[in-house]
Amino acid sequence: MVLMIVSGRSGSGKSVALRALEDMGFYCVDNLPVELLPELARTLATRDTSAAVSIDVRNMPESPEVLETAMDHLPESFTPQLLFLDADRNTLIRRYSDTRRLHPLSSKNLSLENAIDQENELLEPLRSRADLIIDTSEMSVHELAEMLRARLLGKRERELTMVFESFGFKHGIPIDADYVFDVRFLPNPHWDPKLRPMTGLDKPVAAFLDRHTEVHNFIYQTRSYLEQWLPALENNNRSYLTVAIGCTGGKHRSVYVAEQLADYFRSRGKNVQSRHRTLEKRK
């Protein structure tokens, strides 16, 4: 497991880095006192979870030895790594001007320029010990997150999870849906007394729907649409894509179509989850 310490000058992108690490599965803590690092690591060791902790000028120990002592007392299962983010002086000034936030050292009656320079001196002990230094001067938020994934995971793209969920329109449209597809126009197994008690997960219902060309056409065209735009969605710095399929009651058609789409993208090596809202309510 890894204990990633994220530091750097204010405005260099520490919050962005912490969010990116959280998306990679790290347990993230913002501005934890250095002295508590061993305690956090011992707690997480039982969960087999890597952690990321941000340290800035506000919680920097007075002596570098305090950090070294904390590192020495980490559980053996953790490997410490220090990530330091930086940006040139003019970029930091511009970012503060854009956000209109106060610099952490501004309370010392320093000008923004002097606060940035003093912070640089205070953080030098951390910078000199960094395993990885990233200059974010020319980076966007998305580019920084992408670089971290490339450096730490060895790949550029985020593992986007596709969620296919069925629902019934009479129960309302899911508020978490990125895309909503209406399949109420497809042939309805509900009108067959033998199929009515079943769901789209049952083979007789699947066989009924599989006999209809319009069902095949809809599934094919929907998956083609998603495949066309999936690369752009994956590059949009997101973790989930939720596709909601709705029929009247959320029991037959939407369940079948959602499962068909989930199986298709799963067979293409994508991270896929499926859920069925109406069926979950019946349990």
From Swiss-Prot:
The UniProt annotation puts the region (RNA-binding) at 266-283
Q: Keywords, A to Z?
A: ATP-binding, GTP-binding, Nucleotide-binding, RNA-binding
Give the binding site residues for GTP: D56, V57, R58, N59
Q: Which GO terms describe its molecular function?
A: ATP binding; GTP binding; RNA binding
| Residues reported to bind ATP | G8, R9, S10, G11, S12, G13, K14, S15
InterPro entries attached to this UniProt entry: P-loop_NTPase (IPR027417), RapZ-like (IPR005337), RapZ-like_N (IPR053930), RapZ_C (IPR053931)
The text of the family note is: Belongs to the RapZ-like family. RapZ subfamily.
Q: What HAMAP family does UniProt report for this protein, alphabetically? A: RapZ_like
How is the quaternary structure described?
Answer: Homotrimer.
Describe the function of this protein.
Modulates the synthesis of GlmS, by affecting the processing and stability of the regulatory small RNA GlmZ. When glucosamine-6-phosphate (GlcN6P) concentrations are high in the cell, RapZ binds GlmZ and targets it to cleavage by RNase E. Consequently, GlmZ is inactivated and unable to activate GlmS synthesis. Under low GlcN6P concentrations, RapZ is sequestered and inactivated by an other regulatory small RNA, GlmY, preventing GlmZ degradation and leading to synthesis of GlmS.
* NCBIfam families registered for this protein in UniProt: PRK05416.1
Which protein, by its recorded name, is this?
RNase adapter protein RapZ
Upper lineage ranks?
Bacteria, Pseudomonadati, Pseudomonadota, Gammaproteobacteria, Enterobacterales
